[in-house]
A protein has these predicted regions:
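Mid-length scaffold segments of soluble, non-membrane domains
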Residues: 21-104
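Short amphipathic alpha-helical segments, especially helix-boundary/capping motifs
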Residues: 5-9, 69, 139-143
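Signal peptide-directed extracytoplasmic domains
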Residues: 1-35
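A structured, mid-to-C-terminal "fold-capping" secondary-structure block
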Residues: 81-177
Length: 177
């Protein structure tokens, strides 16, 4: 929390949102291919349209006119959901170091998403391991600085057992998707 709170105070919110938009745009293949794997062809088309609009009108993805001007909503599909569609049980709840809450199915899904992520391939061929980790950590801190502080506090503060509260919130959120 102290890292993203400090980052929050130094970087203006619009800059943080623009960085998030860029990372979301560049990682579009994850959601696009998972829509295809889930036979959600309309969703795949929506993802492709968002990518084209945001890459052109949105200045390389730093802006999100697909959402703000055209109301084209991101699909947010991942390989954990794809495995669930094909009847793989969610499995055990886990908290992965540096990655946060997950289930065994979603942890396996992270590997599938990594293969579909263009940043994985850029990291593999063009960056040193420490640069790749730095890139991932920067994206994570940027995301946390935008929307997790209040959410985490609102879940854990009133809870008798914060671990169970986060577990329950995570699993309920995944079931909705």
């Amino acid at each position: 929390k102290p890292i993203y709170t400090g980052y929050n105070s130094m970087i203006p919110v619009q800059a943080r949102v623009s960085v998030r938009n860029f990372y979301t745009n560049i990682t579009m293949p994850i959601s696009f291919f998972n829509c295809l794997f889930q036979s959600n062809f309309k969703g795949a088309g929506t993802e492709m349209l968002r990518f084209v609009v945001n890459s052109t009108i949105g200045v390389g993805g730093f802006l999100d006119p697909a959402k703000s001007r055209f109301n084209i909503i991101k699909q947010n599909r991942d390989f954990g959901q794809t495995l669930g569609k094909y009847k793989m049980e969610s499995g055990t709840y886990l908290v992965l170091p540096f990655l946060g809450p997950s289930t065994s199915r979603d942890a396996i899904g992270l590997a599938g998403d990594a293969v579909l992520n263009p940043l994985t391939w850029v990291s593999w061929f063009f960056l040193t391991p420490i640069e790749s980790i730095g890139n991932y950590m920067y994206d994570s801190v940027n995301d946390l600085s935008i929307d997790t502080g209040d959410t985490y506090e609102s879940i854990t503060k009133p809870a008798i057992d914060p671990y169970v509260a986060v577990q329950d919130a995570y699993i309920q959120n995944r079931v909705k998707k």
